[in-house]
């Protein structure tokens, strides 16, 4: 369980920057999925159930001006930065585990 800070900048304007903190990397990846789900709900307010494919989630991540994580490293007592590609890899692993497949 490594404390993780998610940095999000949806648009080009630096004023759109926000951050969230989580108790673990997996919790943070779930947070990224929730951000996308909220985005879908805003775009489709009359749709009772939101469904999406991982490629749609990754397209959303790619279109954000910036998305990165700072993950606490206990051994050095510092935070290490990670980019969108790393985040997508972690989301992929998380969703595979949730689906019950392990290859």
Curated annotation (Swiss-Prot):
The keyword Cell cycle applies. It holds the Pfam family ER. InterPro entries: EHR_sf (IPR035912), ERH (IPR000781). SUPFAM superfamilies: ERH-like. The keyword Repeat does not apply. Keywords: Cell cycle. Belongs to the E(R) family. May have a role in the cell cycle. Homodimer. This is Enhancer of rudimentary homolog. It comes from Aedes aegypti (Yellowfever mosquito).
């Amino acid at each position: 369980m490594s404390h993780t800070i998610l940095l999000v900048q949806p648009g080009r304007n630096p004023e759109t920057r926000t951050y969230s903190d989580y108790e673990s990397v997996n919790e943070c990846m779930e947070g990224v999925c929730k951000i996308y789900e909220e985005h879908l709900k805003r775009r489709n307010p009359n749709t009772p159930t939101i469904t999406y494919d991982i490629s749609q989630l990754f397209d959303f991540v790619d279109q954000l001006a910036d998305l990165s994580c700072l993950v606490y490293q206990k051994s050095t007592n510092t935070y290490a930065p990670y980019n969108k590609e790393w985040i997508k890899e972690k989301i992929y692993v998380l969703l595979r585990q949730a689906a019950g497949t392990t290859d």
